[in-house]
């Protein structure tokens, strides 16, 4: 599950942060910012580097965004407890955050 919403102020720089409790169950909120329009990709990876889910893969206007991930893979199947990584990628920037899901 993902929901993305742009907020009005434009950030001065790119960022990615976990906006809710970590470890999480059943939902985690993820904030990210784009200082200018860019192709943004936000993915969830396993600790082994396998893509679990792609939350965003689109050109987006500059702004602050919030995503929600409910611990499911791209097929909607619940993933198990464990360590996962959130990665924000743009042509100019990438950042990764470690998260933990406890079922």
Report each predicted region and the residues it spans.
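Surface-exposed loops/turns
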Residues: 25, 36, 61-62, 75, ...
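Solvent-exposed serine/threonine-rich low-complexity stretches and specific carbohydrate-binding patches
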Residues: 52-60
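C-terminal tail/sorting-segment detector
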Residues: 2-6, 59, 67, 77-103
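Glycine-centered coil/turn sites that cap beta-strands in beta-rich domains
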Residues: 2-46, 54, 66-69, 90
